[in-house]
Amino acid sequence: INLYNQLAKHKLFNKTVNFNLKRIKLALVKLGHPEKKLFNVIQVIGSDGKFSVLRNLRYFIEGNKQTVSTHVSPSLVDIKERFWMGKKYLSHKEIRISIKAIEKLKIPLTIYEVLTLVFLINASKTNTDFVIQEAGCLWRLDSNNVIDFPIKQVIVNINKQHLNFLKRKTLNEVILQKVGFL
C-alpha cells in the first residue's frame, strides 16, 4: 500500500483542507521546535510556477557547491519526492519514523500538516546550507508558514486559483491569502 494512502486512512490524520496554524504550532512545540533549527530559509509563494522556481533555485545552489533541503507538494509519483535532503530524497523508512513521532503527539492534523512536520523534523537534522519551501494553496494559513524569519520570499504569478477556499472571491483576497501581505 502506498504511504500516502496509509496516511489518508489514519484515524488521527485527515484529508480535509483546514487552514489553521494552531494545530501545527502545537505540534512544533511538542516536537521541540524543529523549525527554529533551520537557517537560510527561502519560501516560494504564489499560484503558478512555484515548483519550477524552487527546482531552479535548488540547482543554482547545488551548482555553487552548497547543499539544500527542499519541500514540495504535491509529489508526482512517490511521496518521498516531496523531501529532498541535501543529496538524496528521504526514504520511506525515514518518513515512517517521522510519522510515528508525530502520531505520539496525539494531535489531530491534516495530511498536509503531517507531511510539513515530516519535512521540518528531517530538515532540522540534515544541516544543509539552505532550505527551500514551496507554499501550499493559500500561504497565510499554510502549515509551511511557521518560519519566523526566512531570508527570502519569492513571489511567483498569482491568479484566482483555489477560490473555493475563500469567502470573498476577489483577486485582492487571493493575493492577501497567497502572499500574506500587499
Task: Kindly give the residue locations of the regions a language model identified.
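Membrane-proximal helix-turn-helix segments that form the acceptor-binding/catalytic region
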Residues: 175-182
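Hydrophobic anchor at the beta1->P-loop junction of P-loop NTPases
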Residues: 42-44
